[in-house]
Each structure stands twice: as structure tokens, then as C-alpha cells.
Amino acid sequence: MTASSRNNFTETINHRQPDRVVVDFGSTGVTGIHIAIVEKLRNYYGLEKRPVKAVEPYQMLGEVESDLIDAMGIDVVGLFGAKNMFGVPAEDWKLHKTIWGQEVLFPGSFNYTYNSNGDILM
């Protein structure tokens, strides 16, 4: 019988051998996944099509929801604050279309413009 994600994580951080390698995608800004890749992974696993939330807009990291966590066998779940790294509340999500055509969600009070290169400016 394999150990739970929690047990394997506990073994890992205590420098003991877990049942298997602990998998972390998307729980931090370091292990995050770009919004375009989150959408492609959702499609690959046949999950519901919906806009990905840009939980970290500087790197354009997407929210890894519980259905994708289950499909990929991810062990670590992120705990995000009420605001993103720019201090913008993570609420009242609004639809945004990226320069590559992907529809994503940004926090409602995340205000931006585009420059002549198509870059997002805050």
C-alpha cells in the first residue's frame, strides 16, 4: 500500500525516504505553471474547458485546480493569500484575451494597458 501525499511530503521534508517522489506543480511561484500550459494540460486530461485564472500575473502562472491536481497525481497544494504579489485582491475575476488568443481570468482590480509591442503594462 502506498503512503498518502501528506505522509510522503512529511517523509521528504524530514530527510527520510518516501514511498515515491513527491510531485509539486503550481503550489508556489517557483513550481508554478504558465497559463498556456495549464490550459493544454486541462485539454490533455480531458478536463472541463474554462478560462485559467492567472494567480500570479507577473509570470502569468495559472491556477492548478483540484481536478488537474487529481489527474496529474500532484501531492502539494498551494495556499495563496487574499492578494497577489502586486497587492491586487484575488477576487472579482474578469476575462482577458492574451496576445496569443487564450482567454484567461485576471483579478477584477488588476488594471493594465498594452504597449506597441503587445506587452502588458501595469
Label for each model-derived stretch:
Residues 1-122:
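Catalytic cores of TIM-barrel enzymes
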